[in-house]
Amino acid sequence: MNHLDRLERKIGYRFNDIALLKQALTHRSAATQHNERLEFLGDSILNFTIAEALYHQFPRCNEGELSRMRATLVREPTLAILARQFELGDYMSLGSGELKNGGFRRESILADCVEAIIGAMSLDQGLAVTTQVIRNWYQQLLAEIKPGDNQKDAKTRLQEYLQGKHLPLPTYEVVNIQGEAHCQIFTVKCKVKSAEKIDRTFVAKGSSRRKAEQAAAEQILKELDIK
Protein backbone atom coordinates (compact mmCIF):
# COMPACT_ATOMS: atom_id res chain seq x y z
CA MET A 1 0.00 0.00 0.00
CA ASN A 2 1.50 3.37 -1.00
CA HIS A 3 1.05 6.60 0.91
CA LEU A 4 -1.80 7.84 -1.32
CA ASP A 5 -3.69 4.57 -0.75
CA ARG A 6 -3.58 5.36 2.95
CA LEU A 7 -4.87 8.88 2.35
CA GLU A 8 -7.73 7.58 0.20
CA ARG A 9 -8.77 5.32 3.05
CA LYS A 10 -8.70 8.24 5.47
CA ILE A 11 -10.89 10.46 3.29
CA GLY A 12 -13.22 7.60 2.37
CA TYR A 13 -12.80 7.97 -1.37
CA ARG A 14 -10.93 6.03 -4.06
CA PHE A 15 -9.78 8.04 -7.07
CA ASN A 16 -10.09 6.67 -10.59
CA ASP A 17 -7.54 9.25 -11.74
CA ILE A 18 -4.85 9.48 -9.06
CA ALA A 19 -3.28 12.44 -10.88
CA LEU A 20 -6.21 14.57 -9.70
CA LEU A 21 -5.43 13.74 -6.07
CA LYS A 22 -1.74 14.50 -6.60
CA GLN A 23 -2.62 17.88 -8.06
CA ALA A 24 -5.00 18.61 -5.18
CA LEU A 25 -2.12 18.00 -2.77
CA THR A 26 0.29 20.29 -4.63
CA HIS A 27 0.73 23.84 -3.32
CA ARG A 28 1.55 26.64 -5.75
CA SER A 29 5.01 26.93 -4.18
CA ALA A 30 5.89 23.42 -5.39
CA ALA A 31 4.87 23.31 -9.05
CA THR A 32 3.12 25.12 -11.88
CA GLN A 33 0.45 22.40 -11.96
CA HIS A 34 -0.90 23.23 -8.49
CA ASN A 35 -4.20 22.98 -6.65
CA GLU A 36 -5.66 26.49 -6.84
CA ARG A 37 -8.11 25.82 -9.68
CA LEU A 38 -9.31 22.71 -7.88
CA GLU A 39 -9.66 24.76 -4.70
CA PHE A 40 -11.83 27.27 -6.57
CA LEU A 41 -14.11 24.45 -7.73
CA GLY A 42 -14.17 22.70 -4.37
CA ASP A 43 -15.07 25.88 -2.49
CA SER A 44 -18.27 26.26 -4.52
CA ILE A 45 -19.22 22.59 -4.17
CA LEU A 46 -18.60 22.61 -0.42
CA ASN A 47 -20.73 25.72 0.09
CA PHE A 48 -23.57 24.22 -1.96
CA THR A 49 -23.43 20.85 -0.19
CA ILE A 50 -23.47 22.35 3.30
CA ALA A 51 -26.16 24.88 2.34
CA GLU A 52 -28.40 22.10 1.04
CA ALA A 53 -27.80 19.95 4.13
CA LEU A 54 -28.67 22.84 6.47
CA TYR A 55 -31.73 23.77 4.39
CA HIS A 56 -33.24 20.32 4.96
CA GLN A 57 -31.98 19.93 8.53
CA PHE A 58 -33.39 23.24 9.78
CA PRO A 59 -36.70 23.88 7.95
CA ARG A 60 -37.70 26.68 10.36
CA CYS A 61 -34.48 28.69 10.26
CA ASN A 62 -34.34 31.89 8.26
CA GLU A 63 -31.72 32.80 5.66
CA GLY A 64 -29.54 34.65 8.15
CA GLU A 65 -29.39 31.74 10.59
CA LEU A 66 -28.63 29.28 7.80
CA SER A 67 -25.89 31.55 6.43
CA ARG A 68 -24.22 31.86 9.83
CA MET A 69 -24.25 28.11 10.39
CA ARG A 70 -22.84 27.51 6.93
CA ALA A 71 -20.10 30.08 7.55
CA THR A 72 -19.12 28.22 10.72
CA LEU A 73 -18.95 24.88 8.93
CA VAL A 74 -16.95 26.02 5.90
CA ARG A 75 -14.59 28.51 7.52
CA GLU A 76 -10.85 27.99 7.59
CA PRO A 77 -10.46 26.61 11.15
CA THR A 78 -13.17 23.99 10.55
CA LEU A 79 -11.58 22.85 7.30
CA ALA A 80 -8.18 22.75 9.00
CA ILE A 81 -9.63 20.40 11.64
CA LEU A 82 -10.76 18.05 8.88
CA ALA A 83 -7.34 18.32 7.23
CA ARG A 84 -5.61 17.32 10.47
CA GLN A 85 -7.95 14.36 10.89
CA PHE A 86 -6.86 13.22 7.43
CA GLU A 87 -3.22 14.12 8.26
CA LEU A 88 -3.03 16.04 4.98
CA GLY A 89 0.19 17.74 6.03
CA ASP A 90 1.97 14.40 5.60
CA TYR A 91 0.89 14.12 1.97
CA MET A 92 1.15 17.65 0.59
CA SER A 93 3.77 18.84 -1.88
CA LEU A 94 5.21 22.21 -0.83
CA GLY A 95 8.08 24.33 -2.08
CA SER A 96 11.23 24.47 0.05
CA GLY A 97 10.35 27.91 1.42
CA GLU A 98 6.90 26.82 2.59
CA LEU A 99 8.36 23.66 4.09
CA LYS A 100 10.88 25.67 6.12
CA ASN A 101 8.09 27.97 7.30
CA GLY A 102 5.93 25.05 8.43
CA GLY A 103 3.39 25.41 5.64
CA PHE A 104 2.18 21.85 6.19
CA ARG A 105 0.80 23.05 9.56
CA ARG A 106 -0.67 26.37 8.38
CA GLU A 107 -4.45 26.49 8.62
CA SER A 108 -4.93 28.38 5.37
CA ILE A 109 -2.89 25.87 3.35
CA LEU A 110 -4.60 22.90 5.00
CA ALA A 111 -8.06 24.37 4.43
CA ASP A 112 -7.30 25.13 0.79
CA CYS A 113 -6.12 21.56 0.31
CA VAL A 114 -9.41 20.16 1.63
CA GLU A 115 -11.30 22.29 -0.89
CA ALA A 116 -8.94 21.19 -3.66
CA ILE A 117 -9.59 17.52 -2.85
CA ILE A 118 -13.33 18.21 -3.09
CA GLY A 119 -12.79 19.77 -6.50
CA ALA A 120 -10.67 16.81 -7.57
CA MET A 121 -13.34 14.31 -6.48
CA SER A 122 -16.02 16.14 -8.47
CA LEU A 123 -13.94 15.92 -11.64
CA ASP A 124 -13.11 12.29 -10.92
CA GLN A 125 -16.57 10.85 -10.25
CA GLY A 126 -19.08 13.68 -10.40
CA LEU A 127 -21.12 15.85 -8.07
CA ALA A 128 -23.42 13.22 -6.57
CA VAL A 129 -20.58 11.05 -5.27
CA THR A 130 -18.66 14.10 -4.04
CA THR A 131 -21.55 15.56 -2.07
CA GLN A 132 -22.05 12.21 -0.33
CA VAL A 133 -18.39 12.09 0.68
CA ILE A 134 -18.65 15.64 2.06
CA ARG A 135 -21.75 14.67 4.04
CA ASN A 136 -19.81 11.74 5.50
CA TRP A 137 -17.00 14.09 6.55
CA TYR A 138 -19.47 16.49 8.13
CA GLN A 139 -21.80 13.97 9.75
CA GLN A 140 -20.78 14.77 13.32
CA LEU A 141 -20.40 18.51 12.72
CA LEU A 142 -23.87 18.72 11.19
CA ALA A 143 -25.32 16.70 14.06
CA GLU A 144 -23.80 19.06 16.63
CA ILE A 145 -24.44 22.45 15.04
CA LYS A 146 -27.35 24.54 16.30
CA PRO A 147 -28.66 27.95 15.26
CA GLY A 148 -27.61 30.67 17.67
CA ASP A 149 -25.43 33.66 18.39
CA ASN A 150 -22.21 31.64 18.30
CA GLN A 151 -22.65 30.99 14.58
CA LYS A 152 -20.88 34.08 13.32
CA ASP A 153 -18.10 34.42 10.80
CA ALA A 154 -14.77 36.05 11.62
CA LYS A 155 -15.60 39.45 10.11
CA THR A 156 -18.84 39.66 12.10
CA ARG A 157 -17.16 38.62 15.35
CA LEU A 158 -14.38 41.15 14.84
CA GLN A 159 -16.82 43.94 14.03
CA GLU A 160 -18.95 43.24 17.11
CA TYR A 161 -15.85 43.13 19.33
CA LEU A 162 -14.62 46.51 18.07
CA GLN A 163 -18.08 48.04 18.42
CA GLY A 164 -18.27 46.76 21.99
CA LYS A 165 -14.95 48.46 22.75
CA HIS A 166 -16.08 51.68 21.00
CA LEU A 167 -13.23 51.30 18.52
CA PRO A 168 -13.32 52.14 14.80
CA LEU A 169 -14.49 49.38 12.48
CA PRO A 170 -11.83 47.48 10.51
CA THR A 171 -10.95 48.54 6.99
CA TYR A 172 -10.26 45.98 4.27
CA GLU A 173 -8.27 46.79 1.15
CA VAL A 174 -7.30 44.56 -1.76
CA VAL A 175 -3.60 45.26 -2.27
CA ASN A 176 -2.82 42.64 -4.90
CA ILE A 177 -4.54 40.25 -7.32
CA GLN A 178 -2.49 37.50 -8.94
CA GLY A 179 -3.36 34.96 -11.59
CA GLU A 180 -5.75 34.68 -14.48
CA ALA A 181 -9.40 35.66 -14.16
CA HIS A 182 -10.57 32.09 -13.50
CA CYS A 183 -7.87 31.38 -10.90
CA GLN A 184 -7.02 34.50 -8.93
CA ILE A 185 -5.36 34.95 -5.56
CA PHE A 186 -6.44 38.04 -3.64
CA THR A 187 -4.20 39.71 -1.05
CA VAL A 188 -6.13 41.81 1.44
CA LYS A 189 -4.81 44.25 4.02
CA CYS A 190 -6.93 44.82 7.12
CA LYS A 191 -6.34 47.68 9.56
CA VAL A 192 -7.72 47.75 13.09
CA LYS A 193 -7.15 49.78 16.22
CA SER A 194 -6.45 47.61 19.27
CA ALA A 195 -7.75 48.15 22.79
CA GLU A 196 -4.50 50.03 23.49
CA LYS A 197 -5.47 52.42 20.64
CA ILE A 198 -2.56 51.10 18.57
CA ASP A 199 -3.03 50.71 14.83
CA ARG A 200 -2.45 47.14 13.66
CA THR A 201 -2.22 45.88 10.08
CA PHE A 202 -2.79 42.28 9.01
CA VAL A 203 -2.39 40.74 5.57
CA ALA A 204 -4.03 37.55 4.28
CA LYS A 205 -4.62 35.78 0.99
CA GLY A 206 -7.52 33.84 -0.48
CA SER A 207 -8.98 32.56 -3.72
CA SER A 208 -11.66 35.27 -3.51
CA ARG A 209 -11.89 38.68 -1.89
CA ARG A 210 -14.39 37.27 0.60
CA LYS A 211 -12.08 34.44 1.64
CA ALA A 212 -9.09 36.76 1.96
CA GLU A 213 -11.05 39.18 4.16
CA GLN A 214 -12.30 36.34 6.35
CA ALA A 215 -8.75 34.97 6.65
CA ALA A 216 -7.48 38.39 7.72
CA ALA A 217 -10.25 38.69 10.31
CA GLU A 218 -9.46 35.20 11.66
CA GLN A 219 -5.81 36.20 11.93
CA ILE A 220 -6.73 39.29 13.95
CA LEU A 221 -9.04 37.37 16.28
CA LYS A 222 -6.22 34.93 17.08
CA GLU A 223 -3.49 37.57 17.38
CA LEU A 224 -5.55 39.75 19.74
CA ASP A 225 -6.99 36.70 21.57
CA ILE A 226 -10.57 37.69 20.80
CA LYS A 227 -13.04 34.88 21.52
Curated annotation (Swiss-Prot):
InterPro entries: dsRBD_dom, RNase_III, RNase_III_dom, RNase_III_sf
Record keywords, A-Z: Cytoplasm, Endonuclease, Hydrolase, Magnesium, Metal-binding, mRNA processing, Nuclease, RNA-binding, rRNA processing, rRNA-binding, tRNA processing
Domain RNase III positions: 4-126
GO biological process: mRNA processing; regulation of gene expression; RNA processing; rRNA processing; tRNA processing
Cofactor(s) required, per the database record: Mg(2+)
Residues that coordinate or bind Mg(2+): E39, D112, E115
Pfam families xref list: dsrm, Ribonucleas_3_3
Catalytically driven reaction(s): Endonucleolytic cleavage to 5'-phosphomonoester
EC number: 3.1.26.3
Subcellular location: Cytoplasm
Residue ranges constituting the DRBM domain according to the UniProt record: 153-226
PROSITE patterns, per database record: DS_RBD, RNASE_3_1, RNASE_3_2
GO CC terms of this entry: cytosol
Entry-linked CDD domains: DSRM_RNAse_III_family, RIBOc
Active site: D43, E115
One GO MF term attached to the UniProt entry: metal ion binding
NCBIfam families, per the entry: RNaseIII (TIGR02191)
UniProt-listed HAMAP family: RNase_III (MF_00104)
Quaternary structure note: Homodimer.
Family note: Belongs to the ribonuclease III family.
UniProt-listed PANTHER family: RIBONUCLEASE 3, RIBONUCLEASE III
Function of the protein: Digests double-stranded RNA. Involved in the processing of primary rRNA transcript to yield the immediate precursors to the large and small rRNAs (23S and 16S). Processes some mRNAs, and tRNAs when they are encoded in the rRNA operon. Processes pre-crRNA and tracrRNA of type II CRISPR loci if present in the organism.
Name of the featured protein: Ribonuclease 3
Gene: rnc
